C-alpha cells in the first residue's frame, strides 16, 4: 500500500510512474517515474528495517536514475535509512518527501 501513496505524490509533482520496472541488468525497480523534463526517479519501498538491511542492490539503482528515494511507512524508523538517498514516508492515501534526494546525474541516465 506504500506504493499507492507514493504514486499519488509523484503524480501531484508531475511524474508518470510504473511499478516493478525491469531494468536492463534484470533487477526491478519498485517504482520508476519520469517527468516532462525527462527527470528519472527510482523509489525503493522498504517495509521494515530488516527489509532494508537485507537489500544490497539499492546502491546500483543510483546509476539508473537522476534521483533515488526510499519509501517507508510511518511505522518504520527513519534513522535506519541511509542518507545517500531521499526519503518518502507514505501510507495508502498519500506521501510526503521528508528528505529530498540529491541529483545524481548531470546528464540523463538510461534505465540501465
PLM region descriptions:
Residues 1-25, 80-112:
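Non-catalytic C-terminal interaction segments of nucleic acid-processing enzymes
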Residues 2, 27, 53-57:
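Amphipathic coiled-coil/heptad-repeat helices and related helical stalk/stem segments
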Residues 10-11, 35-36, 62-64:
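Flexible, charged surface loops at secondary-structure boundaries
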Residues 15, 39, 66:
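Short coil/turn segments at beta-strand junctions that form active-site/ligand-binding loops
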Residues 21, 33-35, 46-47, 74:
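Short glycine-rich, polar/acidic loop-and-turn segments at beta strand-coil junctions
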Residues 25, 29-42:
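Active-site beta-strand-loop-beta-strand hairpin of nuclease catalytic cores
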Residues 38-48, 97-100:
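Short, Lys/Arg-enriched charge-dense amphipathic segments
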Residues 46-92:
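Catalytic cores of nucleic-acid endonucleases
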Amino acid at each position: 500500500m506504500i506504493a499507492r501513496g507514493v504514486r499519488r505524490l509523484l503524480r501531484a509533482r508531475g511524474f508518470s510512474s510504473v511499478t516493478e520496472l525491469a531494468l536492463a541488468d534484470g533487477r526491478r525497480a519498485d517504482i520508476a517515474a519520469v517527468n516532462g523534463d525527462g527527470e528519472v526517479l527510482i523509489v525503493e519501498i522498504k517495509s521494515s528495517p530488516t527489509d532494508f538491511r537485507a537489500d544490497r542492490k539499492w546502491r546500483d539503482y543510483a546509476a539508473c536514475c537522476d534521483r533515488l528515494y526510499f519509501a517507508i511507512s510511518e511505522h518504520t524508523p527513519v534513522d535506519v535509512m541511509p542518507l545517500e538517498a531521499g526519503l518518502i514516508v507514505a501510507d495508502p492515501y498519500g506521501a510526503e518527501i521528508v528528505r529530498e534526494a540529491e541529483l545524481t546525474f548531470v546528464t540523463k541516465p538510461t534505465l540501465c
